[in-house]
C-alpha cells in the first residue's frame, strides 16, 4: 500500500506521523484545537498517576517465584510517597530495618556475589510493573553463558538510584544493576531506566554509573537493552570500572549496522531527491 502524499501546504504532517512528540497540532484562532488540549491534559494526568501509583511488589515477587527467582523486599528511609517526593535523600538510603535484613542475609551467605539486581519503583511504578519481567527474561537468556553468581532480586519501595550502591555494598556484590521507573514524560509514563555500577559502595556519584534509558515497547527494546547492558557488564569486569570511563561501544556498532541494512526506513537518512 502506497503512503498518502505529503500535503505541500503542511509538511509537518509527515513528521507528526513519525513521532509521538507534540508537533503540528494545528490551531483554532490563537489557541490549540480542543482535541490537542484534551490530549495534553490526559497525558499530564497519566504522568501524575504514574508517579503516585503504589508499587505492587507482592505481585512482582510472586511472578519471580514462578520463575524460580528468589526475592527480598526492602524499604528506603522514606516512610511514604510524600516523604519520598519531598526528601530525595531519604530515597537513596535503606531504612534501618532493611539494612539489618541485608546484613543478616550476608552473614548467612558469606563470600559475596558477582551480581545483584535491584528493582525500585522510582518515579513510575507503572514502568516497573510493565517491563521488569520481560526485560529480565531477555537479560537471563543473553547472559546464560556468563558464569556470574547472583543474589536474590531485591525489591525496594520508595527507592532512588543510589540506594543500589548501599545494597551492593552490604551484599558484597561486584556489580549492581538497578531497574527503576523513570520520571514520566507527557508521551512516556512507563519508561524503565537501567543503572549499572561496578564495585558499588555508599557515596558514589553518577559519574561511576552507566545509564540505559527509555526501556519500553515504544522506546529501547528489551533485547537491545539487555545487549547493551551485558556489553557494559563484561567490559566492566575486564577493566574493573564503570561510569564515564566506560563507553557503550555496543550502541555504536548496532547503530552502524542498522543504518547499513535499513537506511530506507529512516527519513533522516534518505538521500535527497534527484
Swiss-Prot record:
Originating organism: Pseudomonas fluorescens (strain Pf0-1)
Family of the protein in this entry: Belongs to the EutC family.
Gene3D superfamilies: Ethanolamine ammonia-lyase light chain (EutC) (3.40.50.11240), Ethanolamine ammonia-lyase light chain (EutC), N-terminal domain (1.10.30.40)
Keyword set includes Lyase: yes
Protein name (record): Ethanolamine ammonia-lyase small subunit
Gene encoding the protein: eutC
GO molecular function: cobalamin binding; ethanolamine ammonia-lyase activity
A Pfam family of this chain: EutC
EC number, as in UniProt: 4.3.1.7
